[in-house]
A protein has these predicted regions:
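Short, solvent-exposed, Trp/other aromatic-anchored flexible loops in extracytoplasmic proteins
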Residues: 103-112, 141, 147-152
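Short helix-loop boundary/capping segments
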Residues: 114-141, 145-146
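Short, hydrophobic/aromatic-enriched beta-strand segments in well-ordered soluble domains
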Residues: 51-56, 142-148
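Bacterial N-terminal signal peptides
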Residues: 12-22
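Surface-exposed, glycine/proline- and aromatic-rich loop segments on solvent-exposed faces
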Residues: 33-113
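C-terminal region of N-terminal signal peptides and the immediate post-cleavage residues
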Residues: 21-31
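Acidic/polar low-complexity flexible segments
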Residues: 152-189
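Bacterial N-terminal signal peptides that target proteins for export
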Residues: 2-14
């Protein structure tokens, strides 16, 4: 089975748990470490990129209570034109899906779409890859060092760092009837 199909199967298998988590998380305000106050993305040499995000609070290196109470928590750098994003996520309640830091922050590329129902902002269509990259967390800053070839693929190869339009903190919630997968993405500010 391909990685893409196994991730889709995993998403379907936890839908009931996600729906319960959505009810719990919907009443919670997002923590300051998910409020992105500044970000950057640029090339580092001919084949590597560096993405960074600064938030309004210290980013925990391990799961805190908010992370444990939500199925997926993350910071995303997104190309809004194609709906693709590189996300740094942490999701101990969902389980392991990465060989790099499976119990802590790790990377995925994802495809997003519109159609989510409030209070969600986007639909999570698919998790496309789990690239390996350097993740540094220092206080309120997260920096990602990655091969440019590992950026999200919008159908014609990886996007460039110049295609990235936004960086945001987010949580993922199940039970969104507006999303084909049932998975809604809520931007946290």
């Amino acid at each position: 089975m391909s990685h893409h199909r196994s991730v889709t199967a995993l998403a379907a298998g936890v839908a009931a748990n996600l729906a319960l988590a959505a009810v719990v998380a919907g009443a919670q305000a997002g923590p300051s470490y998910l409020a992105v106050s500044g970000w950057s993305a640029g090339a580092v040499g001919p084949s590597n990129v560096r993405l960074s995000a600064t938030t309004n609070g210290a980013i925990p290196k391990r799961a805190d209570q908010f992370i444990n109470d939500n199925v997926i928590v993350g910071i995303a750098w997104a190309d809004l034109g194609t709906g693709t994003a590189l996300v740094a996520t942490i999701h101990p309640t969902l389980g392991r899906d990465s060989h790099q830091r499976p119990d802590s922050w790790h990377l995925h590329t994802v495809q997003l779409a519109g159609g989510a129902t409030a209070p969600n902002d986007f639909c999570l269509v698919s998790v496309n890859s789990t690239p390996t990259g350097g993740i540094a967390i220092q206080g309120d800053s997260m920096t990602i060092n990655l091969a440019a070839s590992k950026l999200p693929d919008a159908g014609e190869g990886p996007i460039s760092v110049g295609d990235l339009d936004a960086a945001v903190g987010f949580t993922v919630h199940g039970g969104d009837a507006g999303c084909v997968t049932g998975l809604g993405v809520r931007v946290r500010t």
